[in-house]
Amino acid sequence: QECKCHGTSGSCQFKTCWYVTPDFRAVSTLMRDKLQRAVFVNSRNKNSGAFHPRLNKKRLQRELVYFEKSPDFCEKDPRVDSLGTQGRVCNKTSQQMDNCASLCCGRGHNVLMQTRRERCNCRFHWCC
């Protein structure tokens, strides 16, 4: 919520407030945290969609829940349009999702070293 004061010489005789959308980074951080804490709910009756969680219902009101496990994206699976991760280039020093531990799924990885020669069109200028 943001507010603005109205009045003579900056006094706050009237105050107008309105709701604003939160910062995108704040929302995405919150969603990432909720996704990492998501609670698996085992549905006993899959036809009706009813479930009987073993966890506290108050806790579930503010958490993300899921009732199907995610597919294994490491392996190729045409049913979910997953090409798998085999053959992709990973970044050995990265802490992000492109790191070798995430992409290689425990299969190990090969190190590729390349040397390139390129013309840089550099010039030396004597200045002094």
UniProtKB/Swiss-Prot annotation:
Annotated GO CC locations: extracellular space
Tissues where the protein occurs: In embryo, in dorsal hindbrain; in adults, in brain.
Residue positions of covalent lipid attachment, annotated as O-palmitoleoyl serine: S9
Keywords attached to this entry: Developmental protein, Disulfide bond, Extracellular matrix, Glycoprotein, Lipoprotein, Secreted, Wnt signaling pathway
Post-translational changes noted in the entry: Palmitoleoylation is required for efficient binding to frizzled receptors. Depalmitoleoylation leads to Wnt signaling pathway inhibition.
Gene Ontology process terms (BP): canonical Wnt signaling pathway; cell fate commitment; neuron differentiation
Disulfide pattern: C3-C17, C5-C12, C74-C105, C90-C100, C127-C128
Compartments reported by the entry: Secreted, Extracellular space, Extracellular matrix
Family matches, as Gene3D superfamilies: 3.30.2460.20
GO molecular function: cytokine activity; frizzled binding
Glycosylation sites: N91
Main location: secreted
Pfam families: wnt (PF00110)
Function: Ligand for members of the frizzled family of seven transmembrane receptors. Probable developmental protein. May be a signaling molecule which affects the development of discrete regions of tissues. Is likely to signal over only few cell diameters.
Family: Belongs to the Wnt family.
Protein name: Protein Wnt-10
Species per Swiss-Prot/TrEMBL record: Xenopus laevis (African clawed frog)
Designated gene of the protein: wnt10
